[in-house]
Amino acid sequence: MKNIIAFILLLFSVSLSAQIKSPEEFLGYPIGTKFTYHHQIVAYSRYLATQSNGLAQWQVYGYTSEGREQGQMVIANLPIGVSLEQVQQNHQKRILGEKTDPSLPVIINLSFNVHGNEAAGSEAALNTLYALISKPNKSIPYVILIDPCINPDGRDAYVTQYNRRNYIAGGNADPNDQEHFEGITSGRYNHFSFDLNRDWVWQTQKETQQRLKFYRSWMPMMHADFHEQS
């Protein structure tokens, strides 16, 4: 009986992978050949959620100062009969030192692109989302929260100028090329020229306030924040 169930799950996994479009298939270009605008990131995230057969949910947690959507993908492989709400409630009790169910899953948070001009982060997030949803690991329970772009306004400011100036697929390594000069407005910051990576404690910016409200509703055991290195 176990072998039959394992075989059915394998068939389901292969079928799911075959049906879901990769970032390249959805966007029309290979990841890394150009930068993706934030609305395209949201569109692909929503697409993945609809194709995940209940594995993933795209949850909107706010909007930026320029009106761009802020959201996180919640990818959850849960025991039969267990809901996301139960996992959240169980973990909140654990934080307070109350008795909890030790069998419920680990909660992991991955965030990308807090500095908008470190734009490779969101491209990596798209590939990460695709890998986790198209070929899910069903052997262990887990909840993975993925924020593909913490700073949508800064990202689009950078991506717009980069895509206008970049004439070579994959970029020009010459440091004197105009693609390496952002101009007056740096995509590192948000709409109000504030570095969101310096706002975790003070929470002066709209984007931070909304994100941390979502974060506190989960209080993940692990948080990895992805940056570039020059």
Q: What is each stretch, according to the model?
A:
Residues M1-I4:
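Positively charged n-region of N-terminal signal peptides that target proteins for export
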Residues H38-I80:
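A non-catalytic alpha/beta surface segment that caps or lines the substrate-entry region
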Residues V74-S103:
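Carboxylate-rich, divalent-cation-coordinating active-site regions
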Residues L96-S111, A119-S230:
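Active-site/substrate-binding loop(s) of hydrolase catalytic cores
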